[in-house]
């Protein structure tokens, strides 16, 4: 309940870059023989690689507001947890991020495609991925300021662990 109206709101996470560089390299190829542009043209219903925050309107419908409140792009997110982390009466939002490898990086995929399609056939694509470093990202936490405003306070609250996190648990210990 992000707005304290007594109605349950919910969020679904996905992979949207939190900065311009990450956003662009994760888009995939838009042209060429190995293009991933089909993904944009043919899905039904369309799928968007970003978080979705659904606000309960108290009717039969929810309103999707992740872009409106600044929570749509939190990198390669696995877990979303709502909780009043600073005891101010508002539900804050915590995201865990990271991946074993950067599988959505279009630049890497294109480079690997060139290498694996070459005449030399030195390495398989799986070998190339194995040699890549894990895709380490910082976890993020956003303070709920009320009135549908959120502020990234990850480093202030020291919850910006840099690595690969695929889950989390939240509990009130006292």
Labelled PLM ranges:
Residues 1-174:
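Acidic, glycine/proline-rich Ca2+-coordinating loop motifs
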């Amino acid at each position: 309940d992000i707005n304290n109206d007594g109605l349950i709101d919910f969020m679904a996470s996905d992979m949207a870059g939190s900065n311009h560089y990450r956003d662009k390299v994760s888009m995939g190829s838009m042209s060429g023989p190995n293009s991933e542009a089909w993904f944009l043209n043919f899905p039904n219903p369309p799928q968007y690689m970003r978080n979705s925050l659904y606000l309960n309107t108290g009717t039969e419908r929810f309103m999707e507001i992740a872009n409106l409140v600044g929570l749509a792009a939190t990198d390669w997110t696995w877990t979303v947890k709502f909780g009043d982390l600073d005891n101010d009466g508002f539900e804050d939002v915590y995201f865990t991020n990271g991946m074993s490898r950067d599988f959505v990086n279009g630049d890497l995929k294109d480079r690997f495609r060139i290498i694996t399609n070459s005449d030399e056939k030195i390495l398989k694509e799986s070998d190339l991925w194995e040699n890549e470093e894990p895709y380490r990202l910082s976890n993020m936490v956003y303070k709920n300021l009320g009135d549908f405003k959120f502020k990234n306070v990850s480093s202030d609250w020291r919850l910006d662990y840099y690595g690969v996190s695929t889950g989390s648990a939240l509990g009130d210990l006292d």
